[in-house]
């Protein structure tokens, strides 16, 4: 149950207790069998479907507050739950249950000349703190992924989705209880005060092993600045789509429309369209016409405006903006070299896509752009753990340490070495 900050215990005490419970739950969870964890996940999926009416009612409360507070349409879309999205949440949890258990997997093994046999084996990270904004589905995704990887998790969602997240969390706890796993293995921060985030970033007295922020630039920047524990960071999704002169126009039109407009409020939505200057006279107008017909605002460079006068002028700020809305910035570039230069200058290193048929051009795109996910002849909206076969994701990591790209069950593990001998001494 979520409560306000005016309580008998102060925030630090409350959060210290949350950390203590998570640490205690992490030990038995780390040695839970695959069967136990899968039973908990499937039971949680059942509980979510059984609680459908309660979850939708809780979501209605959150949506009413969002409307009262005048939140943007893209924000409301991320917050909204409906029958189909609840079905998808439950199905995502079931899919995670079907994934191979990473815990105990032997990643590598070798023998030494002295007879020692060495194995590198996956282990849980321990306790993961997940701080996210108003996406109720993250409550389920993060809880389920951490459970599958044998980690306890502390969930701190945005206050705007508090009712929805609490209803989903209740179902996750039912799943744990059905498998005789500790209910404290998946906790939701019981206070809405933002001071709770500060306590999590301090590590809760050594209880938290890693923090995963999932949200806007200001949230992630705060986490990176203040965290005293390791962070899997995802700053923002300034994703680019480049249409090369070798591209099939019909394919380019389909991909551009999907990459921008399928869901505008997700981090994998394309925010900048780059078109090879060599085909601008034939390709630009059809592609932008499709986007405009779909309700997208076009912001173009001076060259783009000359070819497509319906566009609005783009400013320098547009090239580094994550709109999360039906807006796209458009520029012409000198082939693959121009596209690479633009992307490496403005990208957040999340996801970039190219539409092209020339193999050498595609090879340069893959080799010379340093982003977590690169796609060829496919929409940027495939930048998703579920689409990668991971069941779901806890976020898209844009850093380079430990995890990069979709953070699924494998990325939520560490490893240890098991060394087997037969009496060897170094002497």
From Swiss-Prot:
Pathway info: Amino-acid biosynthesis; L-proline biosynthesis; L-glutamate 5-semialdehyde from L-glutamate: step 2/2
First-level EC class: oxidoreductase
A single GO BP: L-proline biosynthetic process
Keywords attached to this entry: Amino-acid biosynthesis, Cytoplasm, NADP, Oxidoreductase, Proline biosynthesis
Origin: domain of life: Bacteria
Cellular location(s): Cytoplasm
Entry EC no(s): 1.2.1.41
Catalytic reaction(s) noted: L-glutamate 5-semialdehyde + phosphate + NADP(+) = L-glutamyl 5-phosphate + NADPH + H(+)
Molecular function as annotated in GO: glutamate-5-semialdehyde dehydrogenase activity; NADP binding
Cell division as UniProt keyword: no
Cellular component, GO, one term: cytoplasm
CDD domains according to UniProt: ALDH_F18-19_ProA-GPR
NADP among keywords: yes
Major location category of this protein: cytoplasm
Record-linked HAMAP family: ProA (MF_00412)
UniProt cross-references to PANTHER family, sorted A to Z: DELTA-1-PYRROLINE-5-CARBOXYLATE SYNTHASE, GLUTAMATE SEMIALDEHYDE DEHYDROGENASE
Matching NCBIfam families: PRK00197.1 (NF001221), proA (TIGR00407)
Family recorded in the similarity comment: Belongs to the gamma-glutamyl phosphate reductase family.
Function: Catalyzes the NADPH-dependent reduction of L-glutamate 5-phosphate into L-glutamate 5-semialdehyde and phosphate. The product spontaneously undergoes cyclization to form 1-pyrroline-5-carboxylate.
Record-given protein name: Gamma-glutamyl phosphate reductase
Organism name: Brucella ovis (strain ATCC 25840 / 63/290 / NCTC 10512)
Gene name for this UniProt entry: proA
């Amino acid at each position: 149950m979520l409560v306000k900050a005016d309580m008998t215990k102060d925030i630090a005490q409350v959060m210290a207790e949350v950390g203590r419970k998570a640490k205690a739950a992490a030990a038995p969870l780390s040695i839970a069998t695959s069967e136990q964890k899968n039973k908990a996940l499937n039971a949680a999926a059942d509980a979510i479907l059984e609680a459908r009416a309660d979850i939708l009612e809780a979501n209605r409360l959150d949506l009413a507050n969002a409307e009262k507070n005048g939140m943007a349409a893209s924000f409301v879309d991320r917050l909204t739950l409906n029958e189909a999205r609840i079905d998808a949440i439950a199905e995502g949890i079931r899919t995670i249950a079907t994934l191979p258990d990473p815990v105990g997997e032997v990643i590598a093994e070798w023998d030494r000349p002295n007879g020692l046999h060495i194995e590198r084996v996956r282990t849980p990270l321990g306790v993961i703190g997940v701080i996210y904004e108003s996406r109720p589905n993250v409550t389920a995704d993060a809880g389920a992924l951490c459970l599958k990887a044998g980690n306890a998790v502390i969930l701190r969602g945005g206050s705007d989705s508090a009712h929805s997240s609490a209803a989903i969390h209740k179902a996750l706890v039912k799943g744990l209880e059905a498998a005789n796993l500790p209910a404290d293995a998946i906790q939701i921060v019981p206070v809405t005060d933002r001071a709770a985030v500060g306590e999590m970033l301090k590590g809760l007295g050594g209880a938290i092993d890693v923090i995963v922020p999932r949200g806007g630039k200001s949230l992630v920047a705060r986490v990176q600045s203040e965290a005293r524990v390791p962070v899997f960071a995802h700053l923002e999704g300034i994703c680019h789509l480049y249409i090369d002169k070798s591209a099939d126009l019909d394919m380019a039109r389909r991909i551009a429309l999907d990459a921008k407009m399928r869901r505008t409020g997700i981090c994998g939505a394309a925010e900048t369209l780059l078109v090879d200057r060599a085909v601008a006279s034939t390709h630009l107008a059809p592609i932008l016409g499709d986007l405009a017909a779909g309700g997208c605002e076009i912001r173009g460079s001076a060259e783009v405006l000359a070819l497509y006068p319906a566009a609005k002028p783009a400013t320098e700020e547009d090239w580094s903006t994550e709109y999360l809305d039906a807006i796209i910035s458009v520029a012409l570039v000198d082939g693959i070299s121009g596209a690479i230069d633009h992307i490496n200058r403005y990208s957040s290193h999340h996801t970039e896509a190219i539409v092209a048929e020339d193999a050498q051009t595609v090879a340069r795109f893959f080799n010379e752009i340093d982003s977590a996910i690169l796609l060829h002849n496919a929409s940027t909206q495939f930048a998703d753990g579920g689409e990668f076969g991971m069941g779901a994701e806890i976020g898209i990591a844009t850093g380079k340490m430990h995890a990069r790209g979709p953070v699924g069950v494998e990325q939520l593990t560490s490893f240890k070495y098991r060394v087997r001998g037969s009496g060897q001494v170094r002497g």
